[in-house]
């Protein structure tokens, strides 16, 4: 299945909405993850010693921005080449060290989609959701390949 220019545009425009309030959406993103998988807290160095998700924490914002930017980049790669190649091959090592598995990728995908839904409000659609899902899945597959 081809990733279309329209899908890439949907990811880009919704990423822009997300990026307009990065501190809020960073907290939401991690809140969604921890609601679903509280044990995942120890997998994130930025949360390990925190009792709650701190608002406007530069480390949390940077990590959240990196995750969403990698999905955005995956969308661009899927549109132009049909595959995702990691720019940072150490991601496989880091995810292996943290003992990330397929279920963790699913939890993060769900949190990512919920966060984008909050960011875009009434512009949320099945088409937008599908574009982010496909891009995220492409990124997840690339990371899992590096893990093996």
Curated annotation (Swiss-Prot):
<comment type="similarity">
    <text>Belongs to the plant globin family.</text>
</comment>
<keyword id="KW-0539">Nucleus</keyword>
<keyword id="KW-0597">Phosphoprotein</keyword>
<dbReference type="InterPro" id="IPR000971">
    <property type="entry name" value="Globin"/>
</dbReference>
<dbReference type="GO" id="GO:0005829">
    <property type="term" value="C:cytosol"/>
</dbReference>
<dbReference type="GO" id="GO:0020037">
    <property type="term" value="F:heme binding"/>
</dbReference>
<dbReference type="Pfam" id="PF00042">
    <property type="entry name" value="Globin"/>
</dbReference>
<feature type="binding site">
    <location>
        <position position="63"/>
    </location>
    <ligand>
        <name>O2</name>
    </ligand>
</feature>
<dbReference type="GO" id="GO:0005344">
    <property type="term" value="F:oxygen carrier activity"/>
</dbReference>
<feature type="binding site">
    <location>
        <position position="98"/>
    </location>
    <ligand>
        <name>heme b</name>
    </ligand>
</feature>
<dbReference type="GO" id="GO:0019825">
    <property type="term" value="F:oxygen binding"/>
</dbReference>
<keyword id="KW-0408">Iron</keyword>
<protein>
    <recommendedName>
        <fullName>Leghemoglobin 29</fullName>
    </recommendedName>
</protein>
<comment type="subunit">
    <text>Monomer.</text>
</comment>
<dbReference type="GO" id="GO:0046872">
    <property type="term" value="F:metal ion binding"/>
</dbReference>
<dbReference type="InterPro" id="IPR012292">
    <property type="entry name" value="Globin/Proto"/>
</dbReference>
<feature type="binding site">
    <location>
        <position position="45"/>
    </location>
    <ligand>
        <name>heme b</name>
    </ligand>
</feature>
<keyword id="KW-0536">Nodulation</keyword>
<keyword id="KW-0561">Oxygen transport</keyword>
<keyword id="KW-0944">Nitration</keyword>
<comment type="function">
    <text>Leghemoglobin that reversibly binds oxygen O(2) through a pentacoordinated heme iron. In root nodules, facilitates the diffusion of oxygen to the bacteroids while preventing the bacterial nitrogenase from being inactivated by buffering dioxygen, nitric oxide and carbon monoxide, and promoting the formation of reactive oxygen species (ROS, e.g. H(2)O(2)). This role is essential for symbiotic nitrogen fixation (SNF).</text>
</comment>
<dbReference type="InterPro" id="IPR001032">
    <property type="entry name" value="Leghaemoglobin-like"/>
</dbReference>
<feature type="modified residue" description="Phosphoserine">
    <location>
        <position position="45"/>
    </location>
</feature>
<keyword id="KW-0963">Cytoplasm</keyword>
<keyword id="KW-0813">Transport</keyword>
<feature type="modified residue" description="Nitrated tyrosine">
    <location>
        <position position="136"/>
    </location>
</feature>
<feature type="binding site" description="proximal binding residue">
    <location>
        <position position="95"/>
    </location>
    <ligand>
        <name>heme b</name>
    </ligand>
</feature>
<keyword id="KW-0535">Nitrogen fixation</keyword>
<dbReference type="GO" id="GO:0009877">
    <property type="term" value="P:nodulation"/>
</dbReference>
<keyword id="KW-0479">Metal-binding</keyword>
<dbReference type="GO" id="GO:0009737">
    <property type="term" value="P:response to abscisic acid"/>
</dbReference>
<feature type="domain" description="Globin">
    <location>
        <begin position="2"/>
        <end position="148"/>
    </location>
</feature>
<dbReference type="GO" id="GO:0005634">
    <property type="term" value="C:nucleus"/>
</dbReference>
<keyword id="KW-0349">Heme</keyword>
<feature type="modified residue" description="Nitrated tyrosine">
    <location>
        <position position="30"/>
    </location>
</feature>
<dbReference type="InterPro" id="IPR009050">
    <property type="entry name" value="Globin-like_sf"/>
</dbReference>
